[in-house]
């Protein structure tokens, strides 16, 4: 159990599978008082409720539907920690016939969905003392791979937005966290052909718990992420995490 999680109310998008499901398990294990399992179909959260009981409360969120996000924020006024985990991945190289369509779809969910989540839940977090907003980005936010280039572009955009959210939300006392997993053992990882090098999803939750405790902005959950993070850290500390003043 972590004292900084004990009794807190957490909302996790994409909670019914993959990293999201693992995050629910992690926060329940760390004695969160309530975990809103945000899913597109409420029925998909039934196994989580069956396993964990009334601590898990299903709520409907589709990151492609801003109205559902606003409704969820109204239905969950007690949230202390928002974890925006849900996302989509298309395997599109830059010149593929489906590249533009893939990019439009991925931006709608991975970037615009982030913006809608932040706009809807920032007032909720402010009303509950600031709390934390955790965004699941990726190592591909910083290093692109041609086979799923449009996904990389959408996550790079989401990382840029997360940096801006950090600056804006600190004014209301909200701790913003940018999480950058490498290959993780999920359906999404399998679809990207990363099964052989994937690491357990539980690493992500453990790293987020540690990042919330330490006040970190960047979180590197797995071995590939830590390797990239080590190379990136000097730049991050001097540019990304620095308060830049006008010359």
Name what the model sees in each region:
Residues 16-17:
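Conserved glycine-rich cofactor-binding loop
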Residues 89-104, 147-150:
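Conserved mid-core segment of classical short-chain dehydrogenase/reductases
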Residues 118, 154:
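Active-site helix of classical SDR
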Residues 138:
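Residue(s) in the substrate-gating loop at a strand-loop-helix junction
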Residues 160, 164-223:
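SDR active-site lid
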